[in-house]
Amino acid sequence: MKAIIAVNNLGFIGKGNTLLWHNKEDLRHFKKLTDGGILLVGYNTFSELPTLSNRGLIIDTRNEFYFDVDWCIGGKKTYEKYSPFFTELHISHIDDNQIGDVTFPNFIDLSADCKIYNYNY
């Protein structure tokens, strides 16, 4: 499974279950990468998501699931829980200094084979 995340200069990924910024370039990048895929999302993140056309959603719960997932799109606990299964990690670095309440996850369990891609917006 691949993962995609956006983080600002201060290490924040969100506030109140939403993004701190609205970066059109990053949103186009997100759509391009995830279009046609099956997305894994945590419940809190799901509750604030807009409709994502041409993508299926699987909402992470405490129960195990046995679906083929293409992308993990957050939130923080979902990233941390599934990070050992990431084959790719796509990180958008947003040039923004807003204070949030959710910080960049601790990916200590990434496999040695996980490829990391960085983008700047």
Please identify what each model-predicted range represents.
Residues 1-121:
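Enzymes that bind and transform nitrogen-containing heteroaromatic metabolites
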